[in-house]
Amino acid sequence: MPIVRFFQHIIDLFVTLILWFYFLFGYLFILVFLYIPAYVFAENRTTAFQNLNHVHLKCFFALTRLLIPRTKFKIPKDVREIRSSIVICNHLSYLDPLLLVSLFQRQRTIVKHTFFQVPIFGWFLNNYGYISSGSGDMIGPAMINNLEAIKEHLASGGILFVFPEGTRSRDGNLLPFNKGVFTIARYCNAPLKLIFIKDTNKLFPPGHFLFNTRNFNEIQLELIGSLEPDYKGNNFSISAVADQARNLFEAKIAKIKSKETEKPSQVYRQK
């Protein structure tokens, strides 16, 4: 009924405004009371900022669970306990990086260069130790500095999470992989953890402003593979490792699609 849909959209709008108000203005509030003291007094400013960002987004998702009870989160222990690794994920929604920051206290990632140019937000990204994808940051001395910083970060227990697709998938299918993350992994001699993200796009779809508060949904994160390549081996190939990672993601997607096609046929047989 139109009147029912109208009120459903009003609820979506109300919840969305609350969540984004907390997300945006929470940064400004924390800036005054926590970030500035950390900036001035913290021994390791980057670590302090990552911890604060982690707490801020952990609260964001606690608020999300409270306001959208029809959405559940299934995040197993083996995902939460990942340390000293490069985490590779598929990408479905703007919520994906926020969710990962809320899970991992020590995290870095690679962010589109344009976000670093946004006032205030870009300042936060720099102080989190996040890395710009701009060409100037991926060549010469800047690249070496970034790689050394990542290597030290991983050695101290942190994680680097990356979406090798580079953008959100609109249909759930895997987009082409950028192989740069595998080059970083070789430089840092780091293990690769493959996390499959499911159904964040149902809560906050690409191209939409509103959260979907009406549908029952379960957001899942699953560790679908752990790779520890022999980076110094004579037969090591970045392309081969990238293909191996991609194959694991594609196998997971195929398995999900197979289950989804089985459900209608099972219902039909029951009738």
Locations of regions flagged by a protein language model:
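Catalytic core of membrane glycerolipid acyltransferases/transacylases, capturing the structured
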Residues: Y39, E43, Q50-L52, E81, ...
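Catalytic-site beta-strand/loop segments enriched in glycine and acidic/polar residues
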Residues: H153-F182
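Membrane-anchoring hydrophobic helices of lipid-metabolizing enzymes
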Residues: P2-S85
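Short gly/ser/thr-rich secondary-structure transition/capping motifs
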Residues: L66-K74, M143-I144, F204-G207
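Long, non-transmembrane cytosolic or organellar matrix-exposed soluble domains/tails
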Residues: R214-K271
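A cross-family acyltransferase "interaction/gating" segment
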Residues: F121-G122, G172-F236
